[in-house]
Amino acid sequence: ACTAGDDTCTNAFQIDRVNILRGYADYQWSWDPTSYVIFEHLGNNGSAQEETEWANYRINEGKGIMLWGKATNNFNQNTMGYASDSNFDWLKHTVKGFTKKHLVAYAESHDEERMMYKNLQYGASSGTYNVKDLKTSLERQKALGAVLFTIPGPKMLWQFGELGYDYSINHCQDETNSDGCRTNPKPIPSEIGYLTNTDRKSVYDVWAKIIGLKLNNKVFETDNYTITSGDLKPRIQITNNLLSTSDLYEVIVIANFTTSTQAIAPLFPFVGNWYNLMDETTLNVTNTNS
């Protein structure tokens, strides 16, 4: 057992901690075998291996524990326009050693600073393009939805992120920001005009459509997907070879988080008609390298 303040011990792999929390899961499943068990563990160093132990626990029985996958900084670096620390390839569950898709990835949570707040405070710029501009920043949040929610597996959305909520987590009732105000009441979107702001409602609509596509198309149930990120031009390829070629069985997701226009090659795996799932237009691809 670790002593108070011994972070080295706490952050190391601890088999007693693994077994205690396995016991909690066993107890819950004894009452409801179909229930989900989700841990907010956020392990690092050796304790990250504990997450693998839990994710794969009783996996042959169709169980296993889900783990929160905090990618707040990685995603916020993208939305702010900074390539450093913007890689989120590790959100592929097998990178963490998980047998099944038990990683609950998220960009925002109750413990993290609001992405839009940081976009507007610290966003990058190039010429007339400025991430600190509200309309511009909200457009970038749409792209965030595309590269977060389409990744196969469960995801978490923190309240009002879908409206580009931009009050700091440390917002005080006197309109200042202070660490001591973290749990203070925050402005409610419906009372400050968010729901009638067309730019914010547009983020909501785009995210809703992406999530709807995720829920209603079996291609996203696959384990066969790749994530390539870290240069502000992330690409996700999703393939479900169990589906018919007449079904939606291949998806390519690309985004541009730089501050300038980019010529990004989608690298379609084959030629023919491809469909834009957002605007429902058709693109005839004749060159897989273009």
Where are the language model's segments positioned?
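Active-site-proximal helices and loops of the catalytic beta/alpha 8
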Residues: 2-112, 120-132, 136-138, 143-155, ...
